[in-house]
Amino acid sequence: MADFDAVLKCWGPVEADFNTVGGMVLARLFKDHPDTQKLFPKFAGIAAGDLAGNAAVAAHGGTVLKKLGELLKAKGNHAAIIKPLANSHATKHKIPINNFKLITEALVHVMQEKAGLDAAGQTALRNVMGIVIADLEANYKELGFTG
């Protein structure tokens, strides 16, 4: 619970502009791990240098961070949020679980830069995302998706 609260303390700048911060997170993910861009068919043709300012990337990043905000505010009581998220990411989008770990690191980096997330906050964010990812993975297994 303390980890969720620690992350929520720095969540204000993210909530203030989900799309801008979300675009930064996805651009960072694609820069650090270029293969992840292939998992997003609508972004496949966007040149690396154009990702950061792309409106579609920003909009999708905003969607990702809004959902993460819901998960944070649920403070671990998130089964009703996780189940449909896992279902769509396993059955429709086919996103391997490791990619959630990769986006976690992109998010940590961006939140450090843009929201002043200190070392303790970074640890808290990694802990929270570890819980979320473990629950996603459990749902993936129930669905028979090993991606």
UniProtKB/Swiss-Prot annotation:
Disulphide bridges: none
Pfam annotation, one family: Globin
GO molecular function: heme binding; metal ion binding; nitrite reductase activity; oxygen binding; oxygen carrier activity; peroxidase activity
Listed EC numbers: 1.7.-.-, 1.11.1.-
Binding site for heme b: H89
Gene3D superfamilies according to UniProt: 6.10.140.2100, 6.10.140.2110
Any one annotated GO CC term: sarcoplasm
Annotated InterPro entries: Globin, Globin-like_sf, Myoglobin
GO biological-process terms attached to the record: removal of superoxide radicals
Residues in Globin domain copies: 2-141
Subunit organization: Monomeric.
Family designation: Belongs to the globin family.
Protein name, per record: Myoglobin
Organism: Auxis rochei
GN (gene name): mb
